[in-house]
Design a protein with these regions (language model features):
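Domain-core and long-helix interface of multi-subunit machines
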Residues: 3-21, 27-53, 121-246
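Short alpha-helical donor nucleotide-sugar binding micro-motif in glycosyltransferases
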Residues: 766, 773-778
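Conserved donor-binding/catalytic core segment of Leloir-type glycosyltransferases
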Residues: 510, 702-720, 726-730
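Aromatic "clamp/platform" in nucleotide-sugar-dependent glycosyltransferases that forms part
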Residues: 786
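Conserved acidic donor-binding segment of nucleotide-sugar-dependent glycosyltransferases
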Residues: 818-829, 837-842
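Short hydrophobic beta-strand element within catalytic cores of glycosyltransferases
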Residues: 803-806
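Donor nucleotide-sugar binding/catalytic pocket of nucleotide-sugar-dependent glycosyltransferases
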Residues: 385, 643-693
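Nucleotide-activated donor-binding/catalytic signature segment of Leloir-type glycosyltransferases, i.e.
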Residues: 750-769
Length: 878
């Protein structure tokens, strides 16, 4: 059974028991945790920097939502104040006074939230003074018979530091009531709270009392009776009342004739007559709520001021994010179509349908998007909570897909125009990278005459603003909902391990931009895919392509856009639907990532890492710094910029997996500054088809059996050093007149190499099943590349008993045992000399035997086992 399915089944059993605990005629339905506009100081630092409240929702609208969702008793729990309750009470509304106080646990230096009910204005003043020490706070509430609830007990901790077990033991001792169902938390977190409380009995409470030297009656009326509550924790109004509590009041009907509902609620809370209600929680509901909030910010946002932002407490990353968000909202507010959509979308979410006249004023290409938004107004009238949530979310997905299509089509036209204009193509890559740098001087942004960009940015962005901003808002809502629910994932994992219940299985999503291409990364991933299927590993490989065919453990997303750049036209850039990827990660129940490419999927990996708070590992296949220098001609300061960008990228991952000792030394050295414990060396293995085959030079190469054959296999490009083959071959031929060279592969330098070696035997790219015969029929493999991080060709060659002569660099240096199964050289002249020396010697059989022996050291089972252990998934995968 899948993890989420198991959680849902356990939750359904729990809800069924709670629903039938009390006689239905004697219960009041209430949402014990909801907010309105008076929750005006956000807990999150970025919200305080931007000076935005947690919501602009009015009390009246909140009450409408609560009543619509069947609540027959009312309360509002704003942060550290009950202003809304007092205002409503003055208007004659029967509302239970309440607040959610942010309290400090001084001995553990941890902040928690405490829902507090039935206090007076004077008591509120005292509670705000005491909340700096939760023990004094709870002593006060005990003395004055003010019921409290520890809100979302497993939320609000630093992901870097797990609160100790003693903290939870002590909180169990001093609290009577615990919020078990919170509408803003996922089912995993809620069920862990329930399981934790279930595992504590009277004997445990007595044990904690003795351990801490605390008399729990100082804090609790009945220390041995632990009650469970529920609340929506709604800030936007949407879904308020869908999670909450049934409160049991014996003889309710007659009691209501003389006692207000708020007093009866207070009585039931004090007596612990509470049964939580709700539903399976995942990110959909919270995504809708955050999208509602983003719309509210866009409609109400005001510039918080740059100086204020710079002087505000918080680290630089918080201020950079705040600065970017502030500029985003400011730009959105200047765009009429986007603001019209946001206003329409928000009003429809709140149940207000626009007039027919307004719909007629829309451009035709926007009408389908706006029409889908209008449907949301009707969805809110759904018959069940699930219908409402599913209806809202499906409309959001439809709108997102429409926006993506519109954005991709327009972006494709823009890029096509850039190709035709060729303003980028005619410039060197050096100058393009230099133009990406942002000047420090403010004057340079004001004085347009200093802007020497070759591209008219405003013209390029024209027509992209609405689909881009709207898509970003939808993606931001998904990101924020996942971040809110899962930012304590490391803690929840360890907490579940302590409870020995609801432990999430380890499951890897492996991301790559390349799978169907003819390159080393693709070849390795094909091998990995086969091993995943053979071994039944909990790993799925994901790529984005129109050509790759899906398979078991191979997920293929169709791109919403497919582009090539004027800079590097050989490689397609496929853009996935980020929301589709976001939901796929959740549905697949993955808990960690491996990424094999630095392109779009590299960015996707970092997005998922931060959205779901999972470990992300980067598998470094390519030396991009050398590629930038050798293949792209980048030099000097711009090469340094590339290095810094790579450093920033690699340091963003939890671990980097490298394929040779040189890479590890470089990454942990002064140039890159990665921590040594974050860099792990791994390796490739060769396909089982690579074994020694009978030599057949005649049919394969069209030469005599005794003709010495030099072999090169791989991409034919300058960065691979292939142009060195011509002078090497020429010099060897002077000594060994009958020697021939066979070159297998294709690439941009093929034509030049054919001109340089007119008598060379050139074979196009062949399927790997045909390569063993070619390797077995050659005499020595020449590898003039200084670029390869591992070089599968070396391992394939050795597996077929073919010695290799390569540069003493990177991957080959770690694989080849010098003077046993080949030679490691330092120059073109030394490679030439060793080739002549080997062909002149009688070492053929000795070297061939050593080659096959060395290849056996690279065993797939061992390599995969060590790889999984290095990414923290070894125990469950094997």
């Amino acid at each position: 059974m899948k993890f989420q399915e198991n959680l849902k089944n356990e939750l359904d059993k729990f809800l069924s028991i709670q629903e039938n605990r009390f006689p239905k005629e004697d219960i009041l339905k209430i949402d014990l945790h909801c907010h309105d506009y008076n929750s005006d100081v956000p807990d999150e630092l970025i919200g305080r920097i931007l000076r935005v409240p947690e919501t602009w929702l009015s009390s009246e609208r909140l009450l409408q939502e609560l009543e619509k969702n069947g609540c027959d008793a009312l309360t509002i729990t704003n942060h550290n104040n009950a202003r809304s309750c007092y205002i409503l009470q003055d208007k004659g509304v029967d509302v239970l006074t309440a607040a959610e106080f942010s309290c400090w646990v001084p001995d553990f230096e941890i902040g928690i939230h405490v829902l507090t009910y039935g206090f007076t204005p004077d008591q509120e003043v005292q509670l705000n003074k005491l909340r700096k020490n939760v023990y004094l706070f709870l002593q006060y509430t005990r003395i004055h018979n003010i019921p409290t609830v520890w809100a979302h007990p497993l939320y609000h901790y630093s992901v870097k530091k797990m609160p100790p077990k003693d903290f939870f033991d002590k909180m169990m001792l001093i609290f009577e009531r615990f919020e078990t169902l919170n509408g803003q938390r996922d089912t995993w977190q809620n069920m862990l709270v329930k399981e934790w409380i279930d595992q504590v009995d009277e004997e445990q409470v007595a044990k904690y009392s003795k351990e801490f030297g605390i008399d729990p009656s100082i804090y609790c009326v009945d220390p041995y009776k632990k009650s469970l509550t529920g609340g929506s924790d709604s800030h936007m109004g949407i879904f308020a009342g869908m999670t909450g509590s049934y409160l049991y009041v014996p003889d309710l009907k007659s009691r209501m004739q003389t006692v207000s509902k708020s007093e009866l609620v207070l009585e039931a809370l004090r007596n612990g007559n509470i049964a939580p209600f709700g539903a399976h929680q995942n990110t959909e509901k919270l995504t809708i709520a955050f999208l509602n909030y983003v719309c509210q910010i866009a409609l109400n946002y005001k510039d918080p001021g740059l100086i204020r932002m710079l002087l505000h407490k918080g680290d630089m990353s918080d201020k950079v994010v705040s600065f970017m968000a502030s500029n985003m909202f400011s730009e959105v507010q200047k765009h009429k179509v986007t603001m019209s959509f946001i206003r329409l979308f928000y009003n429809c979410m709140m149940g207000e349908k626009p007039s027919f006249f307004k719909k007629l004023l829309l451009p035709s290409h926007y009408k389908p998007i706006f029409e889908e938004a209008v449907k949301i107004a009707e969805i809110g009238k759904g018959t069940t909570d699930k219908d409402v949530v599913d209806g809202y979310y499906n409309s959001i997905l439809t709108i997102n897909n429409q926006l993506n299509d519109l954005l991709a089509n327009r972006l494709d036209k823009k890029i096509t125009n850039l190709h035709l204009d060729d303003k980028i193509g005619e410039k060197s890559l050096d100058s393009i990278i230099e133009s990406l740098e942002l000047p420090i001087s403010i004057r340079s942004y004001i004085d347009k005459s200093n802007n020497n960009s070759s591209i008219d940015i405003s013209k390029f962005l024209d027509g992209l603003s609405f689909p881009f901003f709207a898509s970003v808002f939808i993606l931001a809502a998904h990101f924020t909902s996942a971040k809110t629910m899962f930012h304590t994932r490391p803690f929840l994992r360890r907490f579940s391990e302590q409870l020995k219940k609801f432990e999430q299985p380890k499951r890897i999503l492996w991301l790559t931009d390349t799978f169907g291409d003819k390159n080393g990364v693709s070849m390795f991933l094909h091998e990995m895919h086969e091993q995943i299927k053979i071994k039944g590993l909990s790993i799925d490989i994901l790529t984005c392509s129109n050509e790759v065919v899906p398979d078991d453990n191979l997920i293929v997303l169709k791109p919403i856009g497919e582009f090539t750049t004027p800079i590097y036209k050989d490689q397609k850039i496929n853009i996935p639907n980020f929301v589709e990827l976001h939901n796929l990660f959740l549905k697949g129940e993955y808990d960690r990532i491996i990424c094999s490419t630095e392109g779009i999927m590299g960015m996707c990996g970092l997005y998922l890492k931060h959205a779901y708070t999972v470990e992300a590992n980067f598998y470094m296949h390519t030396d991009w710094l050398m590629f930038a220098r050798k293949a792209l001609g980048i030099t000097g300061h711009n090469l340094d910029r590339v290095r810094r960008m790579l450093r920033f990228f690699y340091r963003s991952f939890d671990r980097v997996l490298v394929l040779n000792s040189d890479q590890k030394k470089w990454l942990t050295g002064s140039d890159m500054n990665l921590e040594d414990q974050k860099v792990f060396q791994t390796a490739h293995w060769s396909n089982s088809c690579f074994t020694v085959q009978p030599s057949d030079k005649s049919s394969l190469f069209g030469v005599e059996t005794n003709t010495p054959i030099l072999l090169y296999v791989g991409r034919i490009s300058k960065e691979k050093g292939v142009l060195e083959l011509a002078p090497i071959y020429k010099r060897v031929k002077e000594v060994h007149k009958d020697v021939r060279i066979v070159i297998v592969g294709k690439g941009p330098a093929l034509q030049q190499l054919q001109q340089d070696i007119p008598d060379g035997i050139f074979i196009d790219w062949v399927h790997q099943s045909k390569l063993p015969a070619i390797y077995s029929s050659a005499d020595v493999l020449l590898l003039p590349s200084k670029f390869d991080t591992f070089c599968n060709v070396v391992l394939e060659s050795l597996s077929c008993g073919l010695p290799v002569i390569a540069y003493n660099k990177k991957g080959p240096k770690d694989i080849i045992v010098d003077n046993e199964c080949g030679y490691l050289v330092n120059s073109i002249s030394e490679m030439t000399e060793k080739t002549i020396e080997y062909l002149s010697s009688d070492l053929n059989e000795t070297f061939r035997s050593a080659a096959t022996k060395r290849a056996k050291d690279y065993d797939a089972d061992t390599i995969i086992k060590e790889l999984l252990q290095s990414v923290g998934a070894g125990d469950e995968q094997q």
